[in-house]
C-alpha cells in the first residue's frame, strides 16, 4: 500500500478558500484602486532571483537567516524572493536611463521567508509594493507618505485607529556623527537600535557598551530614542538643533498637516527600520488597537540600491503593506465587510434531462447579460435545487422545467424575498 500523504498545507502557508479569497481580493482591489488614482503603473518580477541581491542589502534577518535558497543545475544560488525592493531595483536598473522620470510603480505579489509563523507573520505572504524612482526631493517623499495614509483611509477606519510614525536615517547618521563612531560599528548600532522595543533597558545598555559606546554616548542614544517630540529631542541633544535632517522632518510633517492628516502623524526617533538599504526618510503605519498594538507596514528612501547592479545610481522611495497585517487591522476594528460571496449569483438547476441543451442556451444568454450563473450539472427536483441554493447562499434561482419550457418562459426567484419574476424564453 502506498504511503498516505498529508492533506495539510505547509506550516506558515495557507489554502485560500473561496470566502478567504474574497476578503483578499477586497483588500487587493482597494490597494490597486488607490495606487491607480495616484497615476502609478502595475508591474511584476519573477519569484526567483539571484540570492546575492538579498544578501547584499536586505539585512541580517531577511537577507541571511530567512532567505529560502537553493542551487540550480548550473550551480547558481537562487532565492525565492523574500521582499520586493531589491527585485524592483534590479528591474528598474535595466530600464531607468531610457524611461521618462519619475517611474511610479506598484505590484501585488507573493513572497516567502523562512521564519517562525506567528500572528501577522506567515512564511508565504502577499504584499503591495509602491515605489517612486527618479526623484530625490521633498515632494516625492510627501507624495509617498500621503499615498500610504490614503491607502489606510480607503478602508474607512475609525478615528485614531492608526498613526504614521516618521523618522529619518539622515537624522540617525547625524546622531552617529556626534558619537564619533567608526564605520564598522554604525551598522551594529543601527541593528541594535532597531531591537530597542524588544530588549530590556539593562540588556540594551549592556549591548551598547559591548559595541564600544562610552557612558556619555549611551546616554545620548537613550535620550534620542526616548524623545517625545522634535522639540524634546533638540532640547536633550542640542547639537542636532539646526541639522538639515531635523528641518526635513519638520517640513514634511507640516505639509501633511496642511493636507489634513495632522491627527495621524507622530515623530518617532525610536523608529529605525531594519533594512540596510534605507538612507533617508523612514516611516511606519502603526495599529493603535489594544489587541493588535504593532507596526502594520513601513517604508522609506533607498537611493543607493541601484549601484549593486552596476547601473547609474537613481533615487527611490517606497513602502510595502502585507495582506495578513492588513486583514488583522480590519478585523480588529470590525471594518471588514461581512458579505455572502454568492449573493449575486444565479443558480440554474437541471430540472429535466430533456432540457439539458436548453439549460446551456439559457445560461449563455444570462451570462451575456453580465449575470454570474452557476449551472446545475446533475438532475434535481425543484425542492432539492432550492435546498442547495439556500444552503450555499445563492442569491437567485432560475427555474426552467418542462412546464415553463412548454410556455416558452423561465422564472427567476429571489432566495431572500421569495419573489418570483417571469421572463420570455425567446
What are these regions (language model features)?
Residues 1-86, 94, 142-146, 163-165:
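TRNA-binding/sensing appendages of the translation machinery
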Residues 63-74, 181-203, 287-289:
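Acidic, His- and aromatic-enriched active-site or binding-groove loops in soluble protein domains
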Residues 45-64, 163-178, 272-279, 380-388, ...:
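Beta-rich nucleic-acid/ligand-interaction surfaces
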Residues 2-17, 184-235:
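N-terminal targeting/leader regions
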Residues 12, 87, 147, 171-175, ...:
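A general alpha-helix detector
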Residues 23-40, 49-50, 85-96, 105-158, ...:
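Positively charged, Gly/Ser-enriched RNA/tRNA-binding surfaces
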